[in-house]
Amino acid sequence: MKILFANVSLPVASRGKIPISILLFFSCFISVKAQEKQQDSTQLKVLDEVLVQAVRVNATSPITHSNVDKEALEKRNLGQDIPILLNYLPSVVTTTDVGAGVGYTGIRIRGINAQSTNVTINGIPYNDAESLGTFWVNLGDFASSVESLQLQRGVGTSTNGSGAFGASVNILTDAVSEKANAEISNSFGSFNTRKHTLKFSTGKLNDHVEIAGRLSQIKSDGYIDRAASNLKSYFLQASYVDDKTLIKALTFSGKEVTYQSWNGLEDLDLLKNDRTYNTAGMYTDANGETQFYDNEVDNYQQDHYQLHWNQRYNNNWSTNVGLNYTKGKGYFEQYKEDEAFADYGLEDVVMGGETISETDLIRRRWLDNDYYVANLGVNYKNDTWNIDFGTSYGYYDGAHFGEIIWAQYASNSEIRHHYYDGNGKKTDFNVFGKATYRLNSQWSLYGDLQVRFVGYKTTGLSSDRIPFNVDENYTFFNPKAGVSYNLNSNNNFYFSYARANREPNRDDFENNQTVKPEQLNDFELGWRHLQETFRFNVNAYYMLYNEQLVLTGNIDGVGNPVRTNSGKSYRLGLEVEAAVAITDQFSVQPNFTLSTNKNKETIVSQDGALTNLGKTNISFSPSFVAANALVYSPINGLQVSLLSKYVGEQYMGNTDSEKSKLDSYFVSDLNVSYELIFSQDNESKPFVKSILLTGLVNNLFNEKYISNGYYYTYDDTWTDPNQVTTIEGAGYYPQATTNFLIGATLKF
């Protein structure tokens, strides 16, 4: 009966019988007939979890968190990206450029954007080192290779990489399987969406070695015109395991080709009458007719290679060593009209005595980067102490360059003329120690100290051909502390404090060379209540910022959000989540977040003069977000869920302008899953162990809503030379109306 409402799934009778075919894919495959196998599988689980133990917390930790396992992901995994699968967790708002959850998607947690959310995979940082963003489009169908994930709200525990600045997502990939198994999964749906997945595991060969893998392709035409996606990916791992050792060598890769849709819609008439209209690739031909360039695409591939060695020495000591290499390379391609030769370092063209200073052209902007990471973790645990020491070093080397692949007038360019070249190098070293001390059966204390050293240097030209030279070094000290109190077996109370510091990203420096690092002091106070048929979590948070890099609402030429320091700001909120088993077959799982998110003082330029707007709302931070799941399980294997989401109104800028407001919306999805399980008890075991049928109707009530957009201003100095007038503009990303996905998975 699990839905993606983590930490609140209920132990009702309908969950008591978990199919063997599902358990084959769990990290701790358990044979119900063999106690020895059960012990082996438990050891496997413990060894696998060492991969993420340094960055995760347990159920009674004073850190606000949600856990999601493979079973919960499986019921909705029909091709949509991981952010969409997490949409119903507390304080989460998801967005998608193409409107249907395939391609470029995003997630905000407590209003905190992707650049401030730390993502790790097996303890290895996944955020892009320069932009600090997370590009889920490069991990097509990665949910099919996830064993579990933990979403921490607030600063959370010390982690590797750029660090959490308000939220973190820690992912553990597929665990070692005891027995050989395989899956074939296919799904189809609206907008010509289809997903094809093949998975396998050899099981443990000679009781020690397992090889497992996945091959996937997802294709979709998208809800927005021409916003097609073609995502190919694989996951492959080889593992060696014995009683105290787990060694994993794994590689996963994703290649995405997506037609661009990051322009959104600014024309309100189009938004009303033709909300799927896409301006990307638009140009005017020689006959004055509007055309669309057919290869206005984003084309990028990312390859990951990881090696992990987990070692348990006894019941107290364990270590983890992790190595990573990531190779990323790709470009986005654009047709551009009437571009000045001078903007590309080219000379004007003279033809028949006429000087031509502009041309239509097709350009590509490239990224070619290498990322290396080394992690080391040591854990000591006894009945009183749980202590972790960890260190991580990351090195990033990224080339940025642009090339012209076609021009109406070639000027003095060469084939694939580079019109800018730049480079960014970043080092990231951190060391941390964290400990939980159990005073007695009721009280426990938590402490966490981290020091992080960051160096960032750029050379060459920006994409606008402006010299771009940054040489910055930062030292950050991030202390954390907390206390947890178990009143009894049903009630747990906690309080925590955490500080986070974070460096600006590449885009921040391009927009403002004097940008400052940001700092967050996070206070969390919570109560967890647990009964057999009722669970209830309440958490209050106060996040106090200094120089928070808030989204201005504007985007750059490739759809990346523009940020700026906001001085003093804060987020104050209350999160409530619950789960109630009405009967053995029916449950309700609601959650909501009520918050106020404010810049303490906002000064802007309006109509040529500086204006103090005083206290304003932080952009993209709705004051009310709620979700609910009505779950009905009439028979074993069948689950019907009505999932609902409400997001209150929000501002896309920090000026409280009506022009920047996004309306509230309420949407519901209907999810049905049925697993037909074939008996494995008789001698003639069937070849197919089970068939899982899944259906999903998104936006059941056909709401025409907008979950994301952008807002900008500029000064009009030409209409009246004696007056400056500030002009406002906004663009919107319409989301899909009612659509569906259906799928079938055969498990062998």
Regions found by a protein language model. Give the residues of each.
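Transmembrane beta-barrel wall of Gram-negative outer-membrane proteins
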Residues: 181, 188-219, 224-261, 308-314, ...
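Gram-negative outer-membrane beta-barrel transporters
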Residues: 441, 542-544, 564-655
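Face-selective signature of the C-terminal outer-membrane beta-barrel domain
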Residues: 299-461, 484-496, 534-540, 586-589, ...
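Short acidic/polar hinge/loop motifs at secondary-structure boundaries
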Residues: 125-153, 172
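C-terminal beta-signal and adjacent terminal beta-strands/loops
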Residues: 588, 646-651, 674-748
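Extracytoplasmic beta-strand/coil segments of soluble accessory domains associated
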Residues: 83-125, 147
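N-terminal periplasmic "start-of-domain" segments of outer-membrane beta-barrel proteins
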Residues: 44-79, 106
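Membrane-embedded beta-barrel scaffold of Gram-negative outer-membrane proteins
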Residues: 312, 318-324, 486, 492-498, ...
